[in-house]
């Protein structure tokens, strides 16, 4: 417990909040170029081949971003839009690629939750 005199001299320090997506530098999304597109395996107890991409952002940062949805058209040098949001079972993956923006196509045959996967409304 500090004395009154110590508080006058130093004051209370407020704990600063750290960002969950520091590479975006406060932006909601950022554009980037895929440097590598590959699959990786999740932590135990899950098992799959998760699609991820290494992306160099316009601010110079390089991040690993998850490619959501079934199937994708990304390859090296594709221009993508990156948003924050981690993938719990992939260590080090703190970003998502936005489907349906820039070079990333939306998910084909998607019927529900289309807005999250960049899919247009199906016309009957």
From Swiss-Prot:
One Pfam family, short name: Ribosom_S12_S23
InterPro entries (alphabetical): NA-bd_OB-fold, Ribosomal_uS12, Ribosomal_uS12_bac
Keyword RNA-binding: yes
Biased composition (Basic residues): 113-124
Residues where 3-methylthioaspartic acid is found: 89
GO molecular function annotations of the record: rRNA binding; structural constituent of ribosome; tRNA binding
Renumbered residue ranges of the record's region Disordered: 1-42, 105-124
Top-rank taxon, per record: Bacteria
Keyword RNA-binding: yes
Gene Ontology CC: one annotated term: small ribosomal subunit
SUPFAM superfamilies, sorted: Nucleic acid-binding proteins (SSF50249)
Keyword field: Methylation, Ribonucleoprotein, Ribosomal protein, RNA-binding, rRNA-binding, tRNA-binding
Gene3D superfamilies attached to this UniProt entry: Nucleic acid-binding proteins
CDD domains per UniProt: Ribosomal_S12 (cd03368)
Function of the molecule: With S4 and S5 plays an important role in translational accuracy. Interacts with and stabilizes bases of the 16S rRNA that are involved in tRNA selection in the A site and with the mRNA backbone. Located at the interface of the 30S and 50S subunits, it traverses the body of the 30S subunit contacting proteins on the other side and probably holding the rRNA structure together. The combined cluster of proteins S8, S12 and S17 appears to hold together the shoulder and platform of the 30S subunit.
Similarity comment: Belongs to the universal ribosomal protein uS12 family.
Subunit text: Part of the 30S ribosomal subunit. Contacts proteins S8 and S17. May interact with IF1 in the 30S initiation complex.
Protein name: Small ribosomal subunit protein uS12
